[in-house]
Amino acid sequence: MIQTQSMLDVADNSGARRVMCIKVLGGSHRRYAGIGDIIKVTVKEAIPRGKVKKGQVMTAVVVRTRHGVRRPDGSIIRFDGNAAVLLNNKQEPIGTRIFGPVTRELRTEKFMKIVSLAPEVL
């Protein structure tokens, strides 16, 4: 569960390393975001010569959370950390590679590009 002020790792090669959630999108006064939800983030840590710079405000999709996601069969998939993938204005990933596993819940029309780039889908 990601909320405002939550710090996330970046799971792509866009140049950002750490981002902070500044808004959970999708309804007024929405408090938490889970896997597959879109959030507004600000870049807190970035590498030199990356596509994004420190201080930029971006859109991102949550791909991994410590809280995890519950499947219809009752199983829960949890991760060691929270991670997001940065998106452009057309909701496409900025990076060309995805690091680490992503969940099957991202297999919607919007995020098929992220699923196809990911090395492992759980």
Curated annotation (Swiss-Prot):
GO terms for molecular function: large ribosomal subunit rRNA binding; structural constituent of ribosome. Part of the 50S ribosomal subunit. Forms a cluster with proteins L3 and L19. In the 70S ribosome, L14 and L19 interact and together make contacts with the 16S rRNA in bridges B5 and B8. GO terms for biological process: translation. InterPro entries: Ribosomal_uL14, Ribosomal_uL14_bac-type, Ribosomal_uL14_CS, Ribosomal_uL14_sf. Belongs to the universal ribosomal protein uL14 family. It comes from the Bacteria. It comes from Stutzerimonas stutzeri (strain A1501). One of its GO terms (cellular component) is cytosolic large ribosomal subunit. This is Large ribosomal subunit protein uL14. Keywords: Ribonucleoprotein, Ribosomal protein, RNA-binding, rRNA-binding. Binds to 23S rRNA. Forms part of two intersubunit bridges in the 70S ribosome. Pfam families: Ribosomal_L14 (PF00238). CDD domains: Ribosomal_uL14.
